[in-house]
């Protein structure tokens, strides 16, 4: 599914044009209202600067938090406008509302190269309902549309899908284009062998991904809390480890499917156990057939790390989604950190394509200081998963075809 992208438009298309850009500025704030991680803002800079440099008038639309369709003073985009002004080295004005006469007057008064940030689109319930009247009001700010919000592309909302009915061309920004290139490329036409490392605490949240990857991968490695559902399905004692009792049959099915398709499915052979869910719990390493009593598994063990590393060494493309253990506790972060280091090394020294597919694995890689070494780090959580599941993202489908 090839979509028209911003890179195909030059100054003749953009000069003097008002361009509505949907960005993902849903950044974390601390209690003082200060941004604690500006990754998502920085990720949109290439698209914004391209438009500035090509003399467009830039109008940014974004959501922040979950204000439930009403104005919430704590969810205004004021700190985002301030940080964006710093990053761009020019003033970014913020409207009081994303629609209405006052906001439209502000967008109409822009000069070439100016940037205006519309206030939180989710202050209106119509945004998430994909209300076309609301979408038309948003679209009235601009002549054309760029979607650069991969993190919201799996939502059919007014600012991601509805506006494309009223603005043409509607194209992908640089970030969205890069996400599609890596994530779709990895599942549609990867350099093989292709491996997926799937972690996280629950099988239920990764069923779609595992099912879809079984049709595409040569190897799948599973870590995180979900492994105990697989072990219990095999009839093993898992002590007090997390288990989804209603997913035992599903775990059996996934193992059987992998076998039938000739996909190498690797589960840890040893785990790090804890006597309680706490950063300073007592811990011990155990083989998976020797877990008992009040112990719970919180990380994969050293033998499993070696097995996973050896399996990954043969691969040309690796997708990682979800941590190997409770990496927020240093004592149980070894598995996750080892995978992060292994991928960084493979990326740097063996030209392996390493894709970190959103969510907690991104946080883990950043915590380990290895983000720069990966081929691609996805900015979308749910959107990454849905793309890896082979689903069509509404915000992408709505753009003009190339």
Swiss-Prot record:
Q: Which SUPFAM superfamilies match?
A: Phosphoglycerate kinase
Query: Principal place where this protein is found?
Result: cytoplasm
Q: Which UniProt keywords apply?
A: ATP-binding, Cytoplasm, Glycolysis, Kinase, Nucleotide-binding, Transferase
Gene3D superfamilies named among the record's database cross-references: Phosphoglycerate kinase, N-terminal domain
Identify the Pfam families for this entry: PGK (PF00162)
Task: Please give a single GO biological process term from the UniProt record.
Answer: glycolytic process
Q: Which GO terms describe its cellular component?
A: cytosol
Q: Where in the cell is it found?
A: Cytoplasm
What reaction gets catalysed by this protein?
(2R)-3-phosphoglycerate + ATP = (2R)-3-phospho-glyceroyl phosphate + ADP
GO molecular function annotation: ADP binding; ATP binding; phosphoglycerate kinase activity
* Binding of substrate, residues: 24-26, 40, 63-66, 122, 155
Tell me if Transmembrane helix is a UniProt keyword of this record.
no
* Coiled-coil parts of chain: none
Q: What class of enzyme is it?
A: transferase
Q: List the disulfide bonds.
A: none
Q: Where does ATP bind?
A: 206, 297, 328, 358-361
Q: In which pathway does it act?
A: Carbohydrate degradation; glycolysis; pyruvate from D-glyceraldehyde 3-phosphate: step 2/5
This enzyme's EC code(s):
2.7.2.3
The family classification in the record reads: Belongs to the phosphoglycerate kinase family.
Q: Which HAMAP family match?
A: Phosphoglyc_kinase
Q: How does it assemble?
A: Monomer.
Full protein name: Phosphoglycerate kinase
* Organism whose genome encodes this protein: Prochlorococcus marinus (strain AS9601)
């Amino acid at each position: 599914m090839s979509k028209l992208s911003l890179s195909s438009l030059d100054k003749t298309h953009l000069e003097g044009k008002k361009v509505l850009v949907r960005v993902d500025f849903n950044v974390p704030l601390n209690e003082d209202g200060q941004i604690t991680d500006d990754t998502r803002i920085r990720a949109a800079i290439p698209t914004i600067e391209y438009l500035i440099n090509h003399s467009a008038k830039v109008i940014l639309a974004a959501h922040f938090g979950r204000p439930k369709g009403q104005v919430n003073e704590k969810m205004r985009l004021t700190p985002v406008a301030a940080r964006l002004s710093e990053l761009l080295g020019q003033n970014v004005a913020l409207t009081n509302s994303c629609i209405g006469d006052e906001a439209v007057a502000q967008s109409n008064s822009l000069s070439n190269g100016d940037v205006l940030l519309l206030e939180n689109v989710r202050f209106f319930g119509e945004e998430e309902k994909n209300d076309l009247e609301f979408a038309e009001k948003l679209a009235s700010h601009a002549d054309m549309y760029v979607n650069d919000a991969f993190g919201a592309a799996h939502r059919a909302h007014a600012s991601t899908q509805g506006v494309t009915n009223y603005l043409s061309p509607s194209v992908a920004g640089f970030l969205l284009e890069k996400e599609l290139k890596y994530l779709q490329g990895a599942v549609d036409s990867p350099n093989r062998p292709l491996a997926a490392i799937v972690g996280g605490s629950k099988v239920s949240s990764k069923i779609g991904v595992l099912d879809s990857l079984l049709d595409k991968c040569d190897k799948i490695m599973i870590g995180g809390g979900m492994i105990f559902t697989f072990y219990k399905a095999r009839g093993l004692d898992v002590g007090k480890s997390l288990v989804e009792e209603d997913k035992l049959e599903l775990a059996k099915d996934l193992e059987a499917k992998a076998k039938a398709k000739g996909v190498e499915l690797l589960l840890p052979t040893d785990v790090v156990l804890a006597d309680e869910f706490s950063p300073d719990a007592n811990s011990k390493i155990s083989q998976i057939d020797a877990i008992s009593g009040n112990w719970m598994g919180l990380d994969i063990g050293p033998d499993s790390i070696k097995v996973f590393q050896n399996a990954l060494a043969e691969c040309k493309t690796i997708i990682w989604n979800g941590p190997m253990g409770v990496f927020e506790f240093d004592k149980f972060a070894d598995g996750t950190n080892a995978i992060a280091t292994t991928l960084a090394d493979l990326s740097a020294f063996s030209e392996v394509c390493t894709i970190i597919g959103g969510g907690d694995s991104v946080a883990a890689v950043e915590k380990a200081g290895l983000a720069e070494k990966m081929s691609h780090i996805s900015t979308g959580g749910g959107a990454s998963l849905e793309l890896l599941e082979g689903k069509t993202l509404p915000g992408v489908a709505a753009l003009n075809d190339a």
